[in-house]
């Protein structure tokens, strides 16, 4: 069973290939320090203040390059363990270890000793680019004495990629310009009454760190500009750091790797201080950290031509072929010739006899591309006016007098990279496979039991590296060293295809010449595709078609969670005009409840009402009808990440397929793919920011190595989104309590037993953020901001006082306003006349709006005006104009 006790994240000496030697004492120097020592006794301040630095005792900043201190083979360079070659971090506590201190395997969910935080840390390809950096201290300090750029310095080093290149760039300065986008604060961690006080110097990022970059962190006193304790004493170098940086005989030869690192850090830091005309002898401590990926995985999945050409493995080979076909879109022979010429040379060295096979396999990669969107045939699903589809009044009764909008329900087959439950892929029948919704006939019904067990894939599965090229070519050299999808191995393996429902809302009447402009809509957490209907009606009145799909693990449920009655639109979506499924036979009702009739993306599963585990949805119990209730979880942080990455890939495929939409069944496309727009609400805006950035940066409009199948998203609206997702969730008035509850509940009562704001609690959020960096909009916003506003405009909407996605949070990157800032938006109000930036930020008054103002029209009359004003400015923007905002609900720009 899952062991929920979270172990300390203190970095043990084994991280750097050390035994746990106490280098400050000769006695008991082979004892293992299994827990961090205390800085002092309760109520006693240290005589001098210094950073905590003792690798043998696990006293280090969490984010250091000790996490890359892998054991080496006899040559001193090759990683001892093949899985270390994937570029991920290492922490001993996540592994089964034998008596020889050798790794056996990573402890997985369900196994004794499983720790979700350590498990996620070991699969990160570097430290977080968005989370705050904590430097533990042995006492409190005067924060006013800490001066960024003077006595605390964040210095990026000059590597192409520190995980590929051992040395900085030859002939160039080893240092880049200092990173200055941060503030500093002192954190006092919560501790039990019988433990010493704990403090840390926190570096609060106001912009993300650069991905795949090594940073040198320097703490240094500079004359009067010294870091001081609260009683005015200058900070001093830690004793253990000084010992490792010196030349005295080590107490154990196993400390040699740590000494090598510390000496390099010290030499680099002193050299840089001297170049700044600062006293090198003022150095207090220095260390390096190496950041993980940001945009790399999704950018490479979107357009394989972006893969790093230095890599000699599967992704790079596929990238060579993809680029050749992108360079020669209308000449297959020329593309094959170009690819062959590159593959046979260095660094790839593919044997001539294997080139054709490489090209054939590489072109089969599931890159986002056109896929058929199936819609009702002519004469089927007609509304009362004879139009194909259902009138929108079938869904929203208040629109009963609407005769100009029709709704079509169809489907699209999408590549699925997370493992689905058994029987859930296209072509399988979950109810007869036997699948995961079967009922075992006996304890020996192995097939059914295995199928039901596979439902657990929804909470513990994750993307795995694509190994098909190595397998199909029978060339072990091309095998990824692990299953981890990282910036070095960015291609995920497709597990199958999964049919997803598509909801299309169109204006009634004849298709205009050239086709309709189109809007992709993405709903928020716990919602479904029908959340688009209120917005889509307004858009249809203005001549736009709206296309919506569900997020992974979301979909229409048979029972309304509020009223407890059968969802009227559930029957409507299946083509029935009634409002209840009770009139159908039992077998059909079972199909409806499971979602298999329309292949709902929740697989007919929802969260158990008591525990966080999947269970079948109910046709009668609204408590078992939570769309998206399994989407974000703390059981396996990588699953939450990959649900989001899957959502981005789904939207990329949907965008690439818009040209296949035939609304009147005349065999011709009815969508103008030069006029593609996007609206995302809440989580849909969060994921939507990452999607639009990935799409626009990797289409051929802006990227010569891009994917020509991806139309440019010309205008976007991100409604109530936010960045730095873990801290956003923690600060949310709506979600915060449910996020904190399992963390702070005692282990005896099934929780993780953490003290809120303790060191371990903060480390959990650090790792959670690091796990999500490759999909968090904070990682993509600055790159998106580089796109000229005349090519792709966008608008961020904020409701002041939002109780779901906070406007801001204690973590500077978390919330709506920080994301708007990263995107380079300019706030506009009713008095704005300059719209030249193309990047806008609109804030709606607290009293007149809420988080749901974009998605829930008509539910709150007070907010009706806000919805109308949001849609008016949206339609203005999508119609090629400016998002001129009018009305009383828009908040004025605050005076400077």
Predicted region positions:
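Cap/lid segment of the alpha/beta-hydrolase catalytic domain
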Residues: 461-491, 511-652
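A catalytic-pocket lid/entrance helix-loop region that shapes and gates access to the active site
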Residues: 34-43, 239-265, 562-586, 686, ...
């Amino acid at each position: 069973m899952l062991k929920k006790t979270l172990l300390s994240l203190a970095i043990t000496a084994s991280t750097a290939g050390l035994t746990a030697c106490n280098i400050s004492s000769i006695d008991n120097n082979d004892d293992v320090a299994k827990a961090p020592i205390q800085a002092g006794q309760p109520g006693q301040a240290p005589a001098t203040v210094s950073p905590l630095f003792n690798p043998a005792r696990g006293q280090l900043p969490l984010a250091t390059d000790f996490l890359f201190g892998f054991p080496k083979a006899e040559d001193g360079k090759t990683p001892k363990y093949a899985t270390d070659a994937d570029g991920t971090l290492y922490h001993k506590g996540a592994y089964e270890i034998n008596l020889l201190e050798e790794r056996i395997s990573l402890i997985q969910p369900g196994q004794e000793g499983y720790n979700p935080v350590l498990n996620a840390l070991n699969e990160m390809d570097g430290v977080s680019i968005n989370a705050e950096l904590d430097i533990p201290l042995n006492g409190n300090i005067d924060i006013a004495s800490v001066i960024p750029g003077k006595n605390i310095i964040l210095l990026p080093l000059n590597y192409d990629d520190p995980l590929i290149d051992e040395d900085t760039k030859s002939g160039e300065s080893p240092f880049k310009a200092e990173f200055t986008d941060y503030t500093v604060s002192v954190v006092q961690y919560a501790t039990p009454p019988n433990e010493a006080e704990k403090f840390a110097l926190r570096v609060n990022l106001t912009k993300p760190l650069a991905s795949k970059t090594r940073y040198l962190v320097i703490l240094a006193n500079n004359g009067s500009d010294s870091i001081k304790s609260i009683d005015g004493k200058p900070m001093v170098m830690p004793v253990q750091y000084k010992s490792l940086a010196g030349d005295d005989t080590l107490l154990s030869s196993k400390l040699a790797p740590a000494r090598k690192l510390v000496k390099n850090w010290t030499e680099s830091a002193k050299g840089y201080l001297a170049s700044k005309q600062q006293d090198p002898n003022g150095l207090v401590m220095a260390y390096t950290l190496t950041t993980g990926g940001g945009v790399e995985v999704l950018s490479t999945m979107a357009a394989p031509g972006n893969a790093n050409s230095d890599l000699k493995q599967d992704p790079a080979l596929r990238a060579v072929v993809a680029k050749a076909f992108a360079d020669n879109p209308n000449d297959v022979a020329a593309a094959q010739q170009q690819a062959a010429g590159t593959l046979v040379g260095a660094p790839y060295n593919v044997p001539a006899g294997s080139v054709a096979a490489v090209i054939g396999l590489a072109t089969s990669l599931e890159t986002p591309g056109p896929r058929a969107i199936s819609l009702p045939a002519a004469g089927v699903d007609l509304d009362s006016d004879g139009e194909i589809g259902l009138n929108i009044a079938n869904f929203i009764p208040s629109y009963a007098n609407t005769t100009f909008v029709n709704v079509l329900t169809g489907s699209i087959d999408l590549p699925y990279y997370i493992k689905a439950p058994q029987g859930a892929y296209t072509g399988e029948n979950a109810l007869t496979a036997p699948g995961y919704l079967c009922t075992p006939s006996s304890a020996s019904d192995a097939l059914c039991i295995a199928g039901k067990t596979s439902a657990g894939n929804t909470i513990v599965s994750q993307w795995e590296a694509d190994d098909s090229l190595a397998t199909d070519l029978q060339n072990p050299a091309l095998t990824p060293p692990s299953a981890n999808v990282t910036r070095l191995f960015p291609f995920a393996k497709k597990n199958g295809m999964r049919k997803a429902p598509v909801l299309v809302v169109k204006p009634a009447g004849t298709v205009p010449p050239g086709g309709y402009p189109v809007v992709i809509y993405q709903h928020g957490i716990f919602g479904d595709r029908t959340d688009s209907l209120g917005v889509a009606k307004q858009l249809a009145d203005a001549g736009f078609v709206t296309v919506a799909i569900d997020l992974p693990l979301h979909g229409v449920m048979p029972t309304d969670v509020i009223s407890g009655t059968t969802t009227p639109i559930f029957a409507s979506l299946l083509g029935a005009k009634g409002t209840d499924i009770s009139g159908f036979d039992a077998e059909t009702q079972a199909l409806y409840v499971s979602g298999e009739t329309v292949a709902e993306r929740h697989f007919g599963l929802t969260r158990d009402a008591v525990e966080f585990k999947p269970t079948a949805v109910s046709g009668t119990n609204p408590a078992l009808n939570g769309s998206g209730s399994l989407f974000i979880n703390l059981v396996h942080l990588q699953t939450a990440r990959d649900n989001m990455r899957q959502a981005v890939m789904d939207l990329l495929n949907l965008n690439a397929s818009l040209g296949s939409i035939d609304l009147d069944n005349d065999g011709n496309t009815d969508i103008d793919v030069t006029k593609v727009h996007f609206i995302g609400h809440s989580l849909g805006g969060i994921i939507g920011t990452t999607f639009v950035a990935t799409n626009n940066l990797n289409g051929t409009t802006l990227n010569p190595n891009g994917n020509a199948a991806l139309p440019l998203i010309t205008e976007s609206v991100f409604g109530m989104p936010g960045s730095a997702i873990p801290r956003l969730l923690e600060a949310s008035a709506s979600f915060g309590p449910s996020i904190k509850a399992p963390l702070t509940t005692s282990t005896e009562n099934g929780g993780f037993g953490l003290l809120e704001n303790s060191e371990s609690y903060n480390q959990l959020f650090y790792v959670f953020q690091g796990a999500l960096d490759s999909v968090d909009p904070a990682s993509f916003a600055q790159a998106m901001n580089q796109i000229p506003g005349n090519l792709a405009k966008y608008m961020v909407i904020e409701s002041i006082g939002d109780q779901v996605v906070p406007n801001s949070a204690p973590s500077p990157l978390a919330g709506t306003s920080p994301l708007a800032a990263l995107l380079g938006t300019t706030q506009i109000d009713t008095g704005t006349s300059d719209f030249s930036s193309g990047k806008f930020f609109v804030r709606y008054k607290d009293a007149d709006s809420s988080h749901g103002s974009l998605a829930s029209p008509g539910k709150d009359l007070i907010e009706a005006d806000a919805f109308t004003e949001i849609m008016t400015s949206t339609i203005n923007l999508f119609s090629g104009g400016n998002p001129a905002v009018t009305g009383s609900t828009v908040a004025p720009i605050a005076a400077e």
